[in-house]
UniProtKB/Swiss-Prot annotation:
GO terms for biological process: cobalamin biosynthetic process; methylation; siroheme biosynthetic process. It holds the Pfam family CysG_dimeriser. Its EC number is 2.1.1.107, 1.3.1.76, 4.99.1.4. S-adenosyl-L-methionine binds at residues 231, 307-309, 312, 337-338, 389, 418. Residues 1-203 are annotated as: Precorrin-2 dehydrogenase /sirohydrochlorin ferrochelatase. This is Siroheme synthase 1. One of its GO terms (molecular function) is NAD binding. Coiled coil: none annotated. Pathway: Cofactor biosynthesis; adenosylcobalamin biosynthesis; precorrin-2 from uroporphyrinogen III: step 1/1; Cofactor biosynthesis; adenosylcobalamin biosynthesis; sirohydrochlorin from precorrin-2: step 1/1; Porphyrin-containing compound metabolism; siroheme biosynthesis; precorrin-2 from uroporphyrinogen III: step 1/1; Porphyrin-containing compound metabolism; siroheme biosynthesis; siroheme from sirohydrochlorin: step 1/1. It comes from Pectobacterium atrosepticum (strain SCRI 1043 / ATCC BAA-672). Residues 222-480 are annotated as: Uroporphyrinogen-III C-methyltransferase.
Amino acid sequence: MNYLPIFADLRQRPVLVVGGGEVATRKIDLLQRAGAEVKIVALALAEPLAAQHQAGQVEWLAQSFTPELLSGVFLVIAATDDAELNAAVFEAANQRHLLVNVVDDQPKCTFIFPSIVDRSPLVVAISSGGQAPVLARLLREKLESLLPASLGTMAEIAGSWRDRIKTRLHSMPARRRFWERLFVGRFASLVSAGQLEQAEGELQQQLVNQQDEQQLPAAARGEVALVGAGPGDAGLLTLRGLQVMQQADVVLYDHLVSADVLDLVRRDAERICVGKRASTHSLPQGEINQLLVKLAQEGKRVVRLKGGDPFIFGRGGEELQAVAQAGITFQVVPGVTAAAGVTAYAGIPLTHRDHAQSVIFITGHCRPDGDSLDWSTLARGRQTLAIYMGTMKAAEISQQLIAHGRSAQTPVAVISRGTRHDQQVQIGTLQELEHLARQAPTPALLVIGEVVDLHHQIAWFGQTTPTVPQDSRPAVVNLA
């Protein structure tokens, strides 16, 4: 992040604008909408600015710029077509540690103006940091069409009730829940329809409901949401998953959850890494189960965020059993499992009419006392094997499949960090699986079957060419 997005209170604060032409006029209009006291330094004024000066709306200093004019100023804008003058304004302001913007000269800016969607008091600011202003403008236009004009009225009503809500709902979590429910419910529809009196009545009813809820024991208010985070690319997170993450009081997450997905969690939610990887846990599974129950019994909305889908080799079922036995309300938000997302990004269809009529999901990390795999069934042809957490067992997997009849030349793929910018796909044969797995960064998915050969034709993610040369050695393809 090259710029920190902040909202400055300019009401009754002096802002100096150097320049009196068309560009200065546009900037001054924006400053006045924010309540700034504008001083213009220019030898002449464009007609709109001259009219504002006559009306007493701006102060005009009809002289050349001197550094002394910066005394007592909050921020500075240079909006002239004189590069030398603009540079002088920048240097003088910078020496005095004043925020300064030289229009259309980013290196001479200590702040920049974003594209704005104005639904005052709700304001959305968009910036590309000066790298792609047209892209920022297009995004603003998109948001203009998506955000209803009634949002401003909704925010004004909320502001008028804010102090009263604080006196009746004493805890921050209770107030947050109240506002979240209010803004997505009937209240929003009434405001949008212009029925403001009815909207305030709905607000009062929701406040009563929230107060009644606060009388319940904490354990009755807490809840757990088991959310699948997908394989890594934040774009694969479900809409429902995002909504639940944005409402969480606390989030328990694994190492497999990508940083991009974690960035979507509500900013002030507590985050606890329980750090699960194959055979390695920051917390034992039993302690994770107990922590989920404990946090929910404190009245918190708990999100258990798991890579992929929580019910596919994620032990999500075990966690929910503990939650259910404690009598806690819960919900499940499915996620894109690694076998589906990672293979799609690698250009490997799990089934194909010519190659595989079935797919089997397998974990390489079984219980030590568990039953052994049915290798005879797994070694059959015309099926795809997708093996989670299998890199440490790659040698055994290869040996057993070959021993039970699968061809040693069966195509295999080891896909590391799938769907992420640093995804790697290693292609080889079943007899080379141990070597490929040893090379692969983790986490990695093993894919075994004839469908792997289609990678050479339809790989698409991050590549400049859809084909990968084949030779007798494993091919390592970096799809970063």
